[in-house]
Amino acid sequence: MKHIAGQYYHIYNRGVEKRNIFASDENYRFLLRRIKEFLPEYSLTFIAYCLMPTHYHFLIRAEEDGSISPFIQRIFNSYTQAFNKQQNRSGTLFEGRAKSKIIDETSYLFHIARYLHLNPVRAGLTLKPEDWIYSNYREFIGLRKGTLYDAAFVREQFETPEEYRKFVEDEIPNEIMRRLEKYMLDDD
């Protein structure tokens, strides 16, 4: 997919055969360091992210045509090489290339961010989204300062971090969930 400047995309992928892509906390931290290291070289903005044991989700805005694919390829080639070396394994780590879905209805952007931030709760990994440290939910609600976060984007919709927290804690209406399905990973 050719990523177009000014558009928002849900980027995701999962491990081969739904296997874990992170074997330790250090693996999560390594990937986040790589993202922060490489991000300044690319014209894109991270809106929301969530790293899960078997998959990842990014909500990204392309600031320049074609900026997302080279970035994703670079960080995950680097990550896969490091992971394979650490785990004494070889071969592919992911189910093919990253998937990308354009968010053509911008009114759903915050619902998608909420969906991503609730992923660890739905998976039974935590009781509250703020307990999962491998997403930027804590930035959204003011518990952590981070660089993979667009504060202006959040303030466009929510006056305070507490408003976003309440939005996330409210159940996603079924009608909204049905509409979000076209933007989501199959069998999440």
Locate each region found by the language model.
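Short Pro-Cys-Gly-centered "Cys-loop" motif that presents a nucleophilic cysteine in a tight turn
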Residues: 1-47, 52, 61-188
